Design a protein with these regions (language model features):
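Active-site neighborhoods and metal-handling regions in enzymes and metal-associated proteins
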Residues: 1-359
Length: 359
């Protein structure tokens, strides 16, 4: 049995869960090394505390590898939920991951005996995925190195001054491929001027003009692991207000990163950056959490926010991305990924955070 599944079983035992239904393809791949995109069909990895694990798979899907667990095949004419229920008749507490569709869960509850208890069990896998092993860390470091190189190319394109937000964003896929990345990890954000005040702006036909801020928020995947970073630069000139806001956000980023080490609460890291920006005169203008966890998915369980008081542990990887957004004028965000080490953290992005005026 692999170490990852052993760690999940330990979490199940701690929570009194004897059967765990996992439907998230990313988590199934993480645990058994099998990739599948089931669409609307039932796809379940059932973990049992006795070690007798089973994968439920529609026979339309292709399996070309040996898996060290039971495989139950079903077809479209079978009642797949009834098939699954036969493996839960002795269950006392069934954990369900947060992705499983109600169209499967609700009928399953009718098939199993009335004494079976169901509860949200995602944390059993989520907690294990929060802490990256050495191989995962190496892949995420490489993904961030690719991102550093790619954002340099993106900023050079912006400096030309003759491409719209959308045109620059559309160049990124080719840049990533040339650097050895698999794909985007999310749709990139390229925003100019007042559009930078929209934290999730969708690139359009806006063109640059002197004095505009430029936000580029982008990420790639490398061998299944994600990167994510943001830099803000300025086109041709920068005002004193823009300079002050940029330095405030950049220094908030640095201050938060400086306190990261095992034992520090994630909410206190958020507070560090938020208080720093508040002292600079901005409260409502910093309108999102400080960061999110990342790995196989660009947004994984856990965040760096006022409401998440978990303590940092070695091997965790998350973003630090303070921002100030002044509606109708401009916005600034600076984002790195950090890897928690034994006594601090490693910043995975090396691209400069000095104030840059391009073009």
């Amino acid at each position: 049995m692999n170490q990852r599944i052993n760690k999940v079983l330990e979490q199940m035992n701690n929570r009194g869960i004897d059967h765990l239904i996992i439907s998230d393809p990313s988590s199934i791949d993480y645990l058994i090394g099998y990739k599948n995109h089931p669409g609307e069909r039932m796809y379940v990895l059932l973990l049992k505390n006795d070690g007798n694990h089973t994968l439920f798979l529609n026979n339309l899907f292709y399996l070309d590898q040996e898996l060290d667990l039971n495989i139950v095949w079903y077809n479209d004419t079978d009642n797949c939920v009834e098939v699954l229920s036969e493996y839960l008749q002795e269950a006392n507490c069934v954990g369900i991951d947060k992705f499983w569709n109600a169209k499967f869960l609700l009928p399953l509850m009718e098939y199993t005996n009335g004494e079976t208890h169901y509860e949200l069990g995602s944390i059993c896998v989520d907690y294990v995925r929060m802490k990256k092993d050495e191989h995962e860390q190496e892949l995420m470091i490489k993904a961030s190195q690719i991102n550093d190189a790619a954002i340099d190319e993106m900023i050079k394109l912006c400096a030309l001054g003759n491409m719209s937000e959308k045109e620059v964003a559309n160049k990124l896929a080719d840049i990533y491929r040339s650097l050895g990345s698999d794909d985007h990890s999310f749709t990139p954000i390229v925003a100019y001027g007042k559009n930078c005040a929209d934290t999730h702006h969708e690139g359009d036909d806006t063109m640059l003009k002197p004095g505009d801020s430029i936000i580029i928020d982008m990420g790639c995947t490398y061998q299944g692991y994600c990167s994510d970073m943001t830099r803000t630069v300025f086109y041709k000139e920068v005002s004193e207000e823009q300079k002050r806001v940029y330095e405030l956000v950049r220094d908030a980023n640095l201050a938060a990163e400086a306190i990261i080490k095992p034992g520090v609460r994630l909410c206190d890291i958020d507070k560090c950056a938020r208080d720093f920006i508040k002292e600079g005169g901005f409260v409502a203008e910093f309108n999102h959490r400080l960061g999110h966890f990342i790995g196989r998915d660009v947004h994984e369980y856990g965040d760096v926010s006022a409401t998440f008081d978990m303590e940092v542990e070695e091997g965790m990887v998350f973003s630090i991305e303070p921002g100030v957004y002044i509606q109708g004028k401009f916005g600034v965000r600076v984002e790195d990924l950090v890897l928690v080490t034994k006594d601090g953290c490693k910043i995975l992005n090396s691209y400069t955070k000095d104030l840059l005026v391009v073009g």
